[in-house]
Amino acid sequence: MKNGIAFRTIGEEFDGFLLIKESTRGTTSNGKPFLTLILRDASGEIEAKLWDATKDDEETLIPEQIIQVTGEINQFRGKHQLKILSIRLSQPMDNVQVTDFLGKAPMEKEELAEKLTEAIFEMENPKIQRLVRAFIKKYQEELLTYPAATKNHHEFASGLAYHVVSMLAIGKELHKLYPEINRDLLYAGIILHDIGKIKELSGVVSTTYTLEGKMLGHIPMMVEEIGLMANELQIEGEEVLILKHLVLSHHGKAEWGSPTPPLVREAELLHLIDLIDAKMNMLGRALEKIQPGEFTERLFAMDNRAFYKPNFEENEG
């Protein structure tokens, strides 16, 4: 979707339909109300400001509403911003629907499901295999449709499964290089590590954090679920403990959200693979939006760095 909002350049005019992802009220220094809107289409999202917002604007311009907007692409603090000139809610005769504005994984759900099944069939430890299969059966529909996050990486439909399948591909190659790695543990950790996000996140459209997600987080919720599922399946043994540890430690550090650091080899590798895939997804989509010789917008999740796309890439591929 090269003509989408994410690919527009500074100074370019915009006239089209967008979906409201977030709407936040603010007040200027002289007391005038305004709205900060996060607007999106299938290509990505952009921040927009609606100055002198009315009470009616606050009540109608809410998440999951489709709007027709005209404006101009500006830059603010290193990021693109849409200056709104006119705005209205979509009407039935506009023939647009919410699903038109959702980004999606580059793989279809059927292929993602097939890749997950292949990984489970490769497992040799019956306890680990039964646990993982039970979770896939319980959450298959959500796993294949949910995003992996609200922003930064894999924040699109089927992003959660695509993140997992991409990590499995990395894990498979690393197992060839380091055959001493316990493949069952690594694959299980990859598949299970973010399933807690199904309870942490609200869904595919205008994804936000649920109350459980805000209060507990996906890591503690998933650790608890592993224990409950093991009891239900009457599975005992060290495998259950290590799987809990893999989930608990996959963010790597306490300041990144893990109560304990990785203390087994497969846990360390899971953390690194997770980091690689998340960062490559962020960078890939940011670099896709620019031309060779240009810098990306500053990426908050990448230490607020702007990345350069080399000129010689223009003549490659």
UniProtKB/Swiss-Prot annotation:
A Pfam family reported for this protein in Swiss-Prot or TrEMBL: tRNA_anti-codon
An annotated GO BP: rRNA 3'-end processing
UniProt keyword Ligase present: no
DNA-binding region as annotated in the record: 17-90
GO MF terms, alphabetically ordered: 3'-5'-RNA exonuclease activity; DNA binding
Residues of the HD domain: 163-279
Top-level lineage group: Bacteria
PROSITE patterns, sorted: HD
InterPro entries: 3'-5'_exoribonuclease_YhaM, HD/PDEase_dom, HD_domain, NA-bd_OB-fold, NA-bd_OB_tRNA, YhaM_exoribonuc/phosphodiest
EC number(s) from the headed UniProt entry: 3.1.-.-
Entry keyword annotation includes Hydrolase: yes
Keyword annotations: DNA-binding, Exonuclease, Hydrolase, Nuclease
Protein name: 3'-5' exoribonuclease YhaM
Annotated source species: Oceanobacillus iheyensis (strain DSM 14371 / CIP 107618 / JCM 11309 / KCTC 3954 / HTE831)
